[in-house]
Amino acid sequence: MNLPRGAAMALGVTSLATLASVSLITIAAAQAPIAGPSASAEANPDNWPSRAATLAPDPAIERRIDDLIAAMSLEQKVGQIIQADIGSVTPNDVYRYHLGSVLNGGNSDPGGRYNAPAKDWLAAADAFYAASMKPNGKLPRIPVIWGSDAVHGHNNVVGATLFPHNIGLGAARNPDLIRRIGEATAIEMRITGLDWTFAPTLAVVRDDRWGRTYEGFGETPEIATSYAAPLIEGLQGKIGDKDWLRGPHIIATAKHFLGDGGTHGGKDQGDAQMPEAQLRDLFSPPYLPALDAGVQSVMVSFSSWNGVKMHGNRSLLTGVMKDRWNFDGFLVGDWNGHGQVAGCSATDCAGSAIAGLDMYMAPDSWKELYRTTLAHARSGSLPVARLDDAVRRILRVKLRAGLFEAGKPSSRPFGGRFELLGGPDHRALAREAVRESLVLLKNAGSLLPLKPGANILVAGDGADNLTKQTGGWTLSWQGTGTNRSDFPNAQSIWEGIDAEVTAAGGSATLSAEGRYSHKPDVAIVIFGEDPYAEFQGDRPDVGYDDAKNLALLRSLKAAGIPTVSVFLSGRAMWVNPFLNASDAFVAAWLPGSEGGGVADMLFGKADFRGKLPYSWPKASDQTAVNVGDADYDPLFAYGFGLTFADKGDLALLPEARSGAAAADPGLLFGAGKPGSGRRLMLGAPGALSTNPGPELIEARGADRAAQEDSVRLRWTGAGPAVAAIVEDAPADLSRQSNGDLALELELKVDKAPSADVSLIMGCGSQCAGGFPLRAMLSEAAKTAKWTRIAIPLRCFEKAGVDMTRVETPFSIATSGALDLVLSSARIVSPSGPTMQCK
């Protein structure tokens, strides 16, 4: 591969390198063919239930909308249907482009700080509002609306109450509890000036491999259908009440329409391959009570139905949702989801609006999308009637919510009432929700409830770990990278146990590794999945693998210590070895900020009442096990859950895994070797092999934290040479690119490069793109410290990489001498600063 020279990048190197903007190295990328529409993805609205409009048209509101639309320019109309992310837009942009909405994505926060204080959120809300209401000639002033993923409380803001994720709330089967959680969440959003949540998720999840399983209430429509109305009424208030959508209430969103939980293989943003009747009967029922409760926005799913993206399916968006169901609010897209429609890109997609989308979620693509959409409106390829209808729907919701007269967010009810954020009443509600969400799966010999006056060992990496306890969508998109100080109004499970035991005069010892000096009366081991969100949580199977905590449980059992396992997870998983090694086993899901609720249950302050919302698998490859299936054969059935009075013994279970342990799909290199399905290749460009000889380049094991957990790569300078991670089969990284994931390397430079160096991602013959590295590596060599390099995948895409068929996730190439040690390479949600690509 002949690599062109590129401009050097500026770099200030510390242990976490901050990268400046860089030039792109581009090699021609072929475009993947676009699939045509499928006849089986054409819904017949007459086959769907019909419903009357929730509200009769309000003549006063409709007249006002008529007046506004008549006074609006074409540019202002186009701006109203575009939503930009606060990480890529300024208040001045909102004013200049007449933008109708902003959002904060999972990794977007005021000032770019994941732990920005609540006051900064309120100040940002005021700034965006003020910009939208600033006089602009004769154009009408239209307030901006700010949307946020408040999916388990106001989870993006430090100090907010964090409720259990939906999977746990599904186990509670308590609609009144759900209503009260909606009310509390709405108030906490109002405190920070936000007026629109992208919740509730009404997914019916049919395959637990899906990375969003924990966002669904269950595997059947039953629970989501019973929860939709009370949760929406908790968030929005009740239709007819004076504070509907106002005062302590906000605007809710029913999502993701439709079939997001039914994709083939549980693949996030995948394809729901099924007949229309199955799509209708399994996945649409929760939307009807949501509409009856007056939900004002519906988010369109990333997924496809029989090969056609929902963002482009007119038969469902317009034919069913708007015409058959008489929905008069607006349809909002998901993160650049319109760009996945056949024939579209993130910056150009009139087809999605024609299909029925009313507001594009265009986080970083908004400016170019504005330009192309305006051109479509001027040319007539986006009919003005469709544009006006989308604008009418958005204005209708803003008028119903009283936003035109509401004043700046800090002046509205609850604005700036920071003492209520994570306040005692809301925390008590969250603790109640934890108590109701836990499911007792095993209780051999009636070990539970425990006596708090005993000598208790608390172990496992989840015991004192609020990051793990709260899961994804917590302060960051993936829920990772947080610290204890980021949770001022929270209690870890260990802290809850310690408080109970201390109050009862007992003794509690925390040791994640399970060490003790005096043999405990009982051990509580808390462990489970690390946080994830969306496709980052997709798995090839549902087997849980954790050699360290399994060994701990077995050692405690061998020592004759009764053991309680508390399992933290976003899905039902195969855990047979852990069940065998435990005397009692509690499915705690992702309980949120109130670890004391777990302690309450372990010590019998309340009896277990949670029932499984998902069937529990008996094998690691039993990924789609749903009640009602012809071959239904779970380990624990849908609706199972013990109480203290039940006989909780469990026969010894088979421990053989159905397949190899699931690999980390984002791991390119780590622990001294390439990730699963990948190879480290070396040699001259075009002549790579696993062992080319040391003439041009060599690789040897190196130590960082453990023996040979890294690799030393040494280029001799005798000629052009490449070190590359190569896929066994081309990888589709398009979802990861759209999701703002990054290629993150950790390396240490022992000898600065003597010639230009390029970091390249490849997608086949004459298809690659990348960036110059020489300046960065030269600076890193001066420090002799471990350096983190993070480059957003979208930068490689901009450089010409076809992200749907990546063959070489990264390669480092130079014709000069270079000596560096590579510790890890991953595709991740970045843990720190990333470079900004031009």
Where are these regions (language model features)?
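C-terminal non-catalytic regions of proteins with extracellular/luminal or membrane-system context
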Residues: 31-55, 191, 370, 374-377, ...
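N-terminal beta-rich core of secreted/periplasmic extracellular enzymes
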Residues: 33-258, 282-366, 374-407, 432-447
